[in-house]
């Protein structure tokens, strides 16, 4: 048996030094001090000392986890990663996670549902990217599917359409075909299915864009026509046409514009 001969406050708030038989033995959190009723003069056997140290390890790990959770919601995997960074053993991590789960500090399904809800509003994402994000965060497939069930087809179309309108502005000088391809790709990158992207593109890019298409192809054709002005006529026409093909313009429109350029050149 060893006797507590001194209890002193550490510089770190909420921590105490325990001296046994006039020698420093270990430090404990205030919660552990209270839980075990540690006081000067109390005698401790080796088994009790081991139990006190184990409880203090849990208290320190719990403090790390709660501080991490105080900033935002996190998954079990993320909390464990944070404790691992602080060199907390896996067995202690499991005990801490069990306490946190019981006290509802962590809940992967709640995290997933909150994440889905947030990604409808802030930095919007589609279901595919959200699913990857949640998997990376350690959420299981069942919880992911449950959370994503709150992301309706109508909401996906509404959010994707807003993103598509922004992309349409970015690609306004592109050919209709190129514009559609780039918008679909942008939406796919954001996590929306190609089915959703196609529906949205058909809404955003309408037949009313014909005038814009004509303006764009004329602008591009004139640039290419000037660029190849030193070529022989046949090569000038060929290279200008090829440039327009690669930008996604259709053959009929290209021929019309090239004809206009040829007429202008003859004049």
Curated annotation (Swiss-Prot):
Database matches in Pfam families: RecX_HTH1, RecX_HTH2, RecX_HTH3
Biological process terms in GO annotation: regulation of DNA repair
Keyword line: Cytoplasm
Record GO cellular component, one term: cytoplasm
Main location: cytoplasm
Origin: domain of life: Bacteria
Subcellular location: Cytoplasm
Keyword Cytoplasm assigned: yes
UniProt keyword annotation of Cytoplasm present: yes
Stated family: Belongs to the RecX family.
Function comment: Modulates RecA activity.
Entry protein name: Regulatory protein RecX
Source organism: Leuconostoc mesenteroides subsp. mesenteroides (strain ATCC 8293 / DSM 20343 / BCRC 11652 / CCM 1803 / JCM 6124 / NCDO 523 / NBRC 100496 / NCIMB 8023 / NCTC 12954 / NRRL B-1118 / 37Y)
């Amino acid at each position: 048996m060893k006797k507590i001969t001194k209890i002193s406050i550490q510089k770190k708030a909420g921590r105490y030094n325990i001296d046994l038989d006039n020698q420093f033995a270990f430090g404990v959190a205030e919660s552990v001090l209270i839980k075990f009723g540690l006081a000067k003069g109390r005698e401790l056997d080796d088994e009790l000392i081991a139990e006190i140290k184990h409880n203090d390890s849990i208290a320190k790990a719990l403090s790390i986890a709660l501080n991490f959770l105080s900033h935002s919601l996190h998954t079990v995997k993320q909390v464990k990663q944070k404790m691992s960074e602080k060199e907390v053993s896996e067995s202690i991590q499991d005990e801490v996670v069990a306490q946190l789960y019981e006290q509802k500090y962590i809940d992967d399904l709640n995290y997933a549902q909150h994440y889905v809800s947030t990604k409808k509003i802030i930095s919007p994402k589609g279901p595919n990217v959200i699913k990857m994000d949640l998997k990376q965060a350690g959420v299981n497939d069942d919880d992911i599917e449950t959370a994503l069930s709150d992301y309706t087809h109508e909401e996906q179309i509404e959010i994707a359409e807003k993103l598509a309108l922004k992309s349409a502005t970015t690609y306004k000088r592109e050919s209709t075909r190129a514009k559609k391809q780039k918008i679909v790709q942008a939406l796919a990158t954001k996590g929306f299915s190609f089915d959703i992207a196609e529906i949205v593109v058909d809404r955003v890019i309408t037949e009313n864009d014909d005038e814009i298409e004509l303006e764009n192809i004329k602008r591009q054709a004139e640039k290419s026509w000037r660029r190849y002005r030193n070529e022989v006529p046949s090569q000038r026409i060929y290279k200008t046409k090829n440039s327009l093909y690669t930008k996604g313009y259709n053959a009929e429109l290209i021929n019309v514009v090239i004809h206009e350029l040829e007429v202008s050149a003859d004049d």
